[in-house]
Curated annotation (Swiss-Prot):
SMART domains: APCDDC
GO MF terms held by the record: Wnt-protein binding
Taxonomic lineage: Eukaryota, Metazoa, Chordata, Craniata, Vertebrata
Protein name: Protein APCDD1-like
Subcellular location(s) of the protein: Membrane
Domain of life per record: Eukaryota
Broad class of where this protein is predominantly found: membrane
Alphabetized UniProt keyword annotations: Glycoprotein, Membrane, Signal, Transmembrane, Transmembrane helix
Transmembrane segments: 481-501
GO BP terms in the entry: negative regulation of Wnt signaling pathway
GO CC terms, sorted: plasma membrane
Membrane topology: Single-pass membrane protein
Length: 501
């Protein structure tokens, strides 16, 4: 979102602001505004990565997923000790996954290789597809897929494997790939299974009211490129929304049982979520350490002031997948327009955001050194940068070394929902995979990032000058400035992406 001004080479993680003791103040009587949802992520959402990842067993979506396009789907994957896998992908006509269109059955073999040198905490894998079949749940879906295939020469060969619309049979399985059916019809449909080439498994404990915490296992697979034309060649460096173990998933989860019991002939029909009208206001935070393509680890905090249509955000970048090693923090602010219903993504609202102010706080030695080596006129003006000290970069029109450019306009997509626990969720448009910015209406997102959670209904006032805002000079997870060993190579690789901004 408005953070697009930040390079996709950097990682922002919102750790939560708190008020530090004033200079000369005695003792520990510091004023804090830090509710539970704004406590440091490692403290409030502890998780453990399983290395090497153990894939065996069934994994399911926990709700309706939105991929760029948009495509609405749910997934149910099963991995076997023999390295074989069976994947069901259920596609829908609607954004609530209540009107099945067609289902894919994908069978193949996957082999874990080595720890990823690009995405920390992930494992690279190879896969081979043995069979791909498709079942159409309506005549309309058959006509739609056939029309897509007929747009290319290779697709027309694949379209011949499908029946004419008048001969549609409910439940019939048509092979798109097998030992008998040669050729890659997945490519003609714009589909790949490259998500299997990047894997991460982690465990966490979900607190339960009046009961022991519940074990939750999550499977993160590689992200899907936001440009369909690039998906065939793209190798993931980020993740999709995670699947969860069918045996160890969050509770309550109305969709989980439906998806776990489904098959290619009986797709799950999900109950619609409680959609909320988009009334921006309050204080929204990341629910976990987020991962973006090009090795970004971050959390976000946004406040929206509905009466003035202004917004503010803190982005904390980290160098590790647990969001414990901070690299730098960005404060950004601006205004947004009144939203209008999206005609392209049902259930979404289109807005335009303007970024007019930004402040930067280097949080490790490498970032501090990089900023001190940059031209003063390109980031913050004259004066040396020091670790943990915030500086205003508005007067220099941003901070070129970090890819921040001001003023900046973005065309956004928002939606709000309520989860089964009654929490309000805010979905913001997915960032372009190539690191560019949605700075034209044509580049407006058609899918969403991980949701933010409503932390407080009234937005705290971040608009006053930095010296009067809650101090970010101490890392909340340690009580003092955390100096993370952040290697120079990832930073250099990251800065290579800046030519896209």
């Amino acid at each position: 979102m408005p953070a697009a001004m930040l390079p996709y080479a950097c990682v922002l993680v919102l750790l939560g602001a708190h008020t530090a003791p004033a200079a000369g103040e005695a003792g520990g009587s510091c004023l804090r505004w830090e509710p539970h949802c704004q406590q440091p992520l490692p403290d409030r959402v502890p998780s453990t990565a399983i290395l090497p990842p153990r894939l065996n067993g069934p994994w399911i979506s926990t709700g309706c997923e939105v991929r760029p396009g948009p495509e609405f789907l749910t997934r149910a994957y099963t991995f076997y000790p023999s390295r074989l896998f069976r994947a069901h992908q259920f596609y829908y006509e609607d954004p609530f996954c209540g009107e099945p269109a067609h289902s894919l059955l994908v069978k193949g073999k996957v082999r874990l290789r080595r720890a990823s040198w690009v995405t920390r905490g992930a494992t690279e894998a190879d896969y081979h597809l043995h069979k791909v079949g498709i079942v159409f749940h309506s005549r309309r879906a058959l006509v739609d897929v056939t029309g897509r295939l007929n747009q290319t020469r290779a697709g027309r060969d694949c379209a011949r494997r499908l029946p004419p619309a008048r001969a549609w049979l409910p439940g019939a399985l048509y092979e798109l790939r097998s030992a008998r059916a040669q050729g890659d019809c997945l490519e003609a449909l714009g589909l790949t299974m490259h998500e299997l080439s990047l894997v991460r498994v982690q465990r966490r404990l979900q607190p339960q009211p009046r009961a022991s915490p519940r074990l939750v296992e999550e499977l993160y697979l590689g992200d899907i490129h936001t440009d369909p034309a690039e998906r065939r060649h793209y190798r993931p460096t980020g993740y999709q929304r995670p699947l969860q173990s069918a045996l160890h998933h969050v509770q309550p989860c109305p969709a989980c049982g439906l998806i776990a019991r489904s098959d290619v002939h009986h797709p799950p029909v999900l109950p619609p979520p409680l959609a909320l009208p988009l009334h921006l206001g309050g204080w929204w935070v990341s629910s976990g350490c987020e991962v973006r393509p090009a090795v970004l680890f971050l959390t976000r905090l946004f406040t929206f002031h509905g009466h003035s249509r202004s917004w503010e955000g803190y982005y904390h970048h980290f160098s590790d997948p647990a969001c414990r090693q901070p690299t730098f923090t960005v404060y950004a602010a601006g205004r947004y327009t009144r939203g209008t219903p999206s005609t392209r993504v049902r259930g979404g609202t289109e807005l335009v955001f303007e970024v007019t102010r930004a402040h930067v706080t280097p949080m490790d030695q490498v970032t501090t050194a990089m900023l001190n080596f940059s031209e003063p006129s390109s980031c913050g003006g004259a004066g040396a940068w020091s670790m943990g000290t915030e500086r205003d970069v508005t007067a220099t029109n941003g901070c070129l070394p970090l890819g921040i450019r001001l003023p900046h306009v973005e065309y956004e997509l928002f939606k709000m929902e309520q989860d089964p626990l009654g929490q309000s969720l805010l979905f913001i448009g997915q960032r372009p995979t190539d690191g560019s910015s949605p700075d034209t209406p044509e580049k407006r997102p058609t899918s969403y990032q991980a949701p933010l959670v409503l932390c407080h209904g009234e937005a705290p006032d971040f608009s006053r000058p930095p010296q009067h805002r809650p101090s970010l000079q101490k890392h909340p997870s340690t009580g003092g400035l955390h100096i993370a060993p952040f290697p120079l190579l990832p930073l250099v690789l990251g800065l290579a992406f800046l030519h896209w901004l």
